[in-house]
UniProtKB/Swiss-Prot annotation:
Organism classification: Eukaryota, Viridiplantae, Streptophyta, Embryophyta, Tracheophyta
Compartments where found: Plastid, Chloroplast
Protein name: Small ribosomal subunit protein uS14c
Keywords associated with the record: Chloroplast, Plastid, Ribonucleoprotein, Ribosomal protein, RNA-binding, rRNA-binding
Gene it is expressed from: rps14
Subunit structure: Part of the 30S ribosomal subunit.
Amino acid sequence: MARKSLIHREKKRHKLEQKYQLIRRSSKKEISKVLPLSEKWKIHRKLQSSPRNSAPIRLHRRCFLTGRPRANYRDFGLSGHILREMVYACLLPGAIRSSW
């Protein structure tokens, strides 16, 4: 189980990313337009002035049961360890154990 503080920090990052999403997207569109270099630098400074944690690259997917940040399956939102346990317990419909 991940520490509560790490999970809380990740939730704060997600909220901050949602808050600044439109600002970041519009700034990036403006930078991609053909503008004088001085204008691009101004827009770039505006983009850099936003908080670091508002960047989507700083988010991690976490298992919603354990909070584990690694080995996550997007389709289920679970870590590999928990996914395997749930498949063995027949809690995930349609998932088949591999056997050979």
